[in-house]
Amino acid sequence: MAAKIKKGDRVVVLAGKDKGKQGSVLQVLPKDNRVVVEGVNMVSRHTKPTQADPQGGIKNKEAALHVSNVAVVDSNGKPTRVGFKIEGDKKVRVAKTTGEVING
């Protein structure tokens, strides 16, 4: 199935501790049906000192969210479902609320 959410999309969290927060997609994990969203679902990781990071310590990073818990934000700033439409010889993503083509 084609990807309805892609890297760089602006999304809003629909459920969980960060419900209502918006951010852009940093990474899509299609095998796990998960996405990593910038500044959302932050977790603390205890890292050992390495040559790349001699300090080590506790670092905050984004954890993956399930795709069903996020929705793409349309041009009006509201969450929308994503559909597909054929324009010429290309298949494009379309916002269900406004009918506009989603860039990406």
Swiss-Prot record:
Pfam families: KOW, ribosomal_L24. One of its GO terms (molecular function) is structural constituent of ribosome. PROSITE patterns: RIBOSOMAL_L24 (PS01108). One of its GO terms (biological process) is translation. The keyword Ribonucleoprotein applies. Keywords: Ribonucleoprotein, Ribosomal protein, RNA-binding, rRNA-binding. Belongs to the universal ribosomal protein uL24 family. One of two assembly initiator proteins, it binds directly to the 5'-end of the 23S rRNA, where it nucleates assembly of the 50S subunit. One of the proteins that surrounds the polypeptide exit tunnel on the outside of the subunit. This is Large ribosomal subunit protein uL24. It comes from Caulobacter vibrioides (strain NA1000 / CB15N). The gene is rplX.
